[in-house]
């Protein structure tokens, strides 16, 4: 639908619609020559929703298109085959970091906060289904200093966790999560630490600078109980933790909270300590291993050969470096292993979120979770020193001076999929027209080579959804074909479109 406040945009959209109609008419020339009165609309009506690169269209409902009886030639054709099926779709989400929760709870009025959370998680709105929850401090902490749930003086320890408390989170993190849960009880919470308590580490500090922050040999059992206490205490507050990873980006050398945890040590921790402790406590969150970049995809391959692999539900990946095809490689080796993208942040990611979504789901991800749900205009508050995410943006931007919230390009990119593909949907066959690149943050190429990329799903109700993204510098004309019928569409450079039909 055109925005009356943007007449120029309406004229442009109308022109584009005329082009599509004209192109569709070309398909029917042969039929007209045989005496037909016009294009035969032999297929279902197709809903069209589009977001442009410059946000001149933002989840805009454009005029419907219709399948006609002929398939065009000399165009890229997205042939949808619903007889060939792949992984299930679990949903999309973002992280409720300490910074995000603080901004939502303390910098917005109650009505503004309710509007934002409803817009993000309401089933009639964006319908996000995942919230990633850092266990204590991450690189985005409103306090500006690291903390854990069991802090003691340097040189001391608390192996019985007598001082354990999630009281810090009671101020604003848990209230924000409770509001999310109230909007949609089906939202799933995934939790993991950036660092255990400092006394559990060889450097007796939160950071992992130069890889010095390793888990002490006598801290494996206390760390397992740390997870048990966290899950129980959050559960008592109405937040059921459905999944965990043992460690965010294990081995990444950081000045902010981090832990040097090798594949062997992570496998040992899961198999001998974490999984048994959770079972004894009657807790059954799904455990995901790894939680790091595609670039280090050899590490999950080593992990799945370890006996600990039987204790985990899947592998969590980050988008910042490497090739999305690593997920497909792992699937080919261990098809039962679920795969999710558990972190990706616009600003330092190799490409836009629309490109990530297509690449991730084409390569066997069941879920994609972006990084911060909300940040301020400066991309903070951050946990200094934080040079690793100094250009990060969030799904929502909070203006602390005006106490207002606005939605970023990530919001609309997520909506192009989350509003139309339901949890339990299944990816179905469709071709793509790009190859996937090996990336290195913003210094590398985009996720994929320039061209048309797409992914298709069938919802539990039988409806079909195609998400197409134009990763090129000019508009692309293409066709969508299904069961012998097709329609033609022209997609502007950098734009994303969603097609939905019964």
Predicted segments, located by residue:
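N-terminal secretory signal peptides that target proteins for export/translocation
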Residues: 1-15
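Sec-dependent signal peptide recognition
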Residues: 16-24
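C-terminal motif of bacterial Sec signal peptides marking the signal peptidase cleavage site
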Residues: 30-33
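Bacterial lipoprotein signal-peptidase II cleavage site
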Residues: 35-40
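Substrate-binding and catalytic surfaces of secreted/luminal carbohydrate-active proteins
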Residues: 43-80, 189-191, 224-242, 253-502
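N-terminal catalytic cores of secreted or lumenal carbohydrate-active enzymes
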Residues: 57-241
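Short, well-ordered beta-to-alpha junction loops that form the rim of enzyme active sites
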Residues: 136, 192-194, 246-249, 292
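Active-site-proximal beta-alpha loop/turn segments in soluble metabolic enzymes
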Residues: 204-216, 249-262
């Amino acid at each position: 639908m055109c925005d009356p406040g943007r007449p120029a945009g309406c004229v442009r959209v109308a022109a584009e619609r005329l082009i599509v109609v004209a192109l569709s008419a070309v398909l029917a020339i042969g039929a007209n020559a045989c005496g037909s009165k016009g294009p035969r609309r032999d297929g279902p009506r197709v809903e069209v929703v589009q977001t442009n690169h410059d946000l001149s269209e933002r989840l805009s409902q454009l005029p419907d298109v219709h399948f006609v009886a002929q398939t065009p030639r000399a165009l890229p054709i997205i042939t949808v085959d619903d007889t060939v099926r792949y992984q299930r779709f679990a949903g999309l989400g973002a992280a409720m970091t300490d910074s995000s929760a603080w901004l939502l709870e303390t910098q917005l009025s109650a009505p503004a906060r309710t509007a934002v959370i409803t817009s993000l998680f309401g089933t009639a709105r964006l319908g996000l289904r995942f919230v990633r929850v850092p266990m204590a401090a991450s690189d985005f902490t409103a306090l500006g200093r690291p903390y854990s749930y069991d802090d003691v003086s340097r040189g001391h320890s608390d192996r019985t966790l007598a001082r354990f408390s999630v009281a810090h989170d009671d101020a604003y993190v848990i209230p924000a999560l409770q509001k999310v849960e109230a909007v949609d009880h089906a939202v799933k919470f995934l939790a993991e630490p950036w660092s255990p308590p400092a006394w559990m580490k060889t450097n007796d500090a939160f950071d992992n600078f130069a890889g010095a922050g390793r888990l002490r040999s006598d801290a494996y059992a206390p760390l397992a109980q740390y997870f048990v206490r966290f899950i129980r205490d959050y559960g008592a507050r109405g937040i059921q933790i459905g999944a965990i990873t043992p460690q965010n980006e294990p081995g990444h050398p950081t000045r902010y909270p981090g832990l040097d945890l090798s594949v062997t040590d992570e496998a040992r921790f899961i198999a001998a300590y974490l999984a048994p402790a959770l079972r004894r406590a009657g807790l059954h969150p799904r455990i995901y291993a790894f939680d790091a970049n595609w670039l280090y995809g050899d590490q999950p391959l080593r992990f799945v050969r370890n006996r600990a692999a039987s204790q985990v539900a899947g592998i969590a990946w980050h988008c910042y470096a490497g090739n999305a095809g690593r997920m497909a490689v792992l699937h080919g080796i261990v098809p039962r292993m679920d795969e999710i993208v558990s972190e990706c942040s616009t600003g330092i990611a190799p490409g836009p979120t629309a490109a990530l979504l297509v690449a991730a789901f084409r390569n066997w991800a069941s879920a994609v979770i972006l990084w911060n749900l909300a940040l301020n205009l400066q991309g903070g508050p951050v946990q200094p020193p934080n040079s690793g995410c100094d250009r990060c943006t969030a799904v929502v931007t909070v203006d602390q001076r005006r106490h207002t919230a606005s939605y970023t390009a990530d919001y609309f990119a997520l909506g192009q999929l989350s509003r139309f593909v339901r949890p339990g949907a299944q990816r179905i066959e469709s071709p793509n027209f790009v190859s996937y690149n090996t990336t290195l943050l913003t210094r590398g190429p985009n996720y994929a080579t320039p061209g048309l990329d797409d992914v298709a799903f069938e919802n539990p109700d039988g409806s079909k959804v195609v998400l197409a993204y134009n990763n090129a510098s000019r508009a692309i004309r293409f066709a969508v074909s299904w069961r012998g019928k097709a329609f033609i569409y022209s997609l502007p450079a950098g734009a994303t479109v969603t097609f939905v039909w019964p």
